[in-house]
């Protein structure tokens, strides 16, 4: 469940997202259910830039083998079924979903999360 960055081990339960989910750090959650929360990104890359954060502690896609697969599938299935609703709460009816994985993938918080980017024309390649 943890990842090495240099000699440092990162446990998702020690991340800012774990603290936001637990309420230890205040946040402006605009969506909250049994499986996830949604917040606005503090460094938006589009007019609408949302983070959908599962409540299940998974560091990233490479850590899926280390968690209860049935709980993971239930959680992620639910989240994917709610993405359009969550995006629409902030006025995005067209959007791009992004999951960053690992250091080279620019994952800045070692807790699996989904970016919803919208509110403008998305270009390809994304860069």
UniProtKB/Swiss-Prot annotation:
Residues 16-127 form the HIT domain. Gene3D superfamilies: HIT-like. GO terms for cellular component: cytoplasm; extracellular matrix; phagocytic vesicle. It comes from the Eukaryota. Pfam families: HIT. InterPro entries: Histidine_triad_CS, Histidine_triad_HIT, HIT-like, HIT-like_sf. One of its GO terms (molecular function) is hydrolase activity. Signal peptide: none annotated. One of its GO terms (biological process) is response to bacterium. PROSITE patterns: HIT_1, HIT_2. CDD domains: PKCI_related. Disulfide bonds: none annotated. This is Protein pkiA.
